[in-house]
Amino acid sequence: MNITALTDNTQGAAGLELYEVYNNGYPTAYGNIIHLKGMTAVGEGELLIGWSGTSGAHAPAFIRSRRDTTDANWSPWAQLYTSAHPPAEFYPVGAPIPWPSDTVPSGYALMQGQTFDKSAYPKLAVAYPSGVIPDMRGWTIKGKPASGRAVLSQEQDGIKSHTHSASASSTDLGTETTSSFDYGTKSTNNTGAHTHSISGTANSAGAHQHKSSGAFGGTNTSIFPNGYTAISNLSAGIMSTTSGSGQTRNAGKTSSDGAHTHSLSGTAASAGAHAHTVGIGAHTHSVAIGSHGHTITVNAAGNAENTVKNIAFNYIVRLA
């Protein structure tokens, strides 16, 4: 029976009825309607099973109802989704789906940066026109910021710019005393040996005379041989009188000559090496440790990348 689809608050017949859908106002052009209505109540409902027009193919199914008052309107038709007719808008093709297994369900693919056939999966090609499924391994999803980043653009890990403050409190440790220790007696090393350079001139010395041993005369006017100077009472070179037999002899002497000097140069012998014994008795020292600060180094810490507590899932995408 071909009946025009009921609209608004129009009621159908009581009981169970079967209608044929054939271009008569239902969601599909062809199909069958199961109409249900109680014998006494006015509430009713309809189930539409459509025809696909292709042998062996699944067709969509729809359902609607109307409450049990005479002025109640029919609800909109709602499609019944099945594995053969999943909701295209409920989870759009191309949306990443966290999947807790390495075994991928039929009709889906892991998101690992692989290419796909755009002609075989036109809906997926709308989401990824490049024909490449994004590689979601190790990546998280972030809402596109208002700064104008492109959809599907990648952002490497990083931390927000910040500073650290560090200080060491100033402390006055006052004056402290070292522990007492007796170092005993120590000897210095043997040293101090040295030399002196010598240079200069010795004093003039060596001037002398010689007594004449040649001929001599008995008077002051005698002439001495061998080139000696004459002797007279005024001569400075008269030697003391030497007595002879019956006469006095006067002997002469040479002039004073032979005075000379010597130049000196060289190095005096090395001398002066010595050591000392030093007694270092038991003693202490006072050390003043005034108010001061210290430089602080803050060492690097952390992991190779920024992470939060997480559980690893595979991302899969529906192929359609």
Curated annotation (Swiss-Prot):
InterPro entries: Phage_lambda_Stf-r1, Phage_tail_collar_dom, Phage_tail_collar_dom_sf, Phage_Tail_Fiber_Structural. Signal peptide: none annotated. Coiled coil: none annotated. It comes from the Bacteria. Residues 172-206, 241-258 have a biased composition (Polar residues). GO terms for molecular function: structural molecule activity. It holds the Pfam family Phage_fiber. Residues 261-270 have a biased composition (Low complexity). Keywords: Repeat. Residues 147-213, 241-270 are annotated as: Disordered. PANTHER family: PROPHAGE SIDE TAIL FIBER PROTEIN HOMOLOG STFQ-RELATED. Belongs to the tail fiber family. This is Prophage side tail fiber protein homolog StfQ. It comes from Escherichia coli (strain K12). The lineage of its organism: Bacteria, Pseudomonadati, Pseudomonadota, Gammaproteobacteria, Enterobacterales.
